[in-house]
Amino acid sequence: MFCCYSAIANYTQRVVSTSLSATEVNHALRFLVHFIGDIHQPLHDEALEVGGNDIDVTFAGAATNLHHIWDTEIPEKYTGGYALSDAKAWAKNLNSAVNSGIYASSAASWIKGLDVTDPFTTTLGWASEANAYVCSTVIPQGQAAVESVDLSGAYYNKAISVVELQIARAGVRLAAYLDAVAKNQKVLAKRLVLDEVDLSGADFLPESRPLSKAKLVREAVGYGCKH
């Protein structure tokens, strides 16, 4: 499992540290934003075939891998491109959906239990939530059902609602998390112990783990994925 939650805990420590330079804190904040987004992508919390990077698929006729289409092809097809203007338009639509649209009734629950003094536990819950979609949406019929298959049709149509939901959750949680860090900066600086962390993010590269381990992790938290 790619330890996004470990990264978030460590970079939270660095953001509130009084012993780091302004540049180091700035870098830590950038990584914190990055990892909170990353943790909501189901395959960033998955060991199977290095988070799907080793599962070959096609998308709109182009060869790629399962991880990549969840990172890139699916959202870009939905937004119509990868320009900053496309991202801003999507963000505006998601903001409306959260404030007064389809997510308005559930958005408050997304930050329930958020505790920046315990970032590991907080974000582990988010990772577990995202990982559940591996079984229900990413590979609901197992790895063999998607290998070498073009996933830009029916698969995309089923996946896009989860992609959009997870991005909305990530945005709401990121805003709430950063607000909480800012409000509790002095308390956090006293309570959190600063660890030595490689700012390149190399400490958080994924480790290869066999499928049986991935199954055990999912079963331990109550997921029924058996493939």
Question: How should these model regions be labeled?
Answer:
Residues 1-35, 42-227:
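C-terminal accessory segments of proteins
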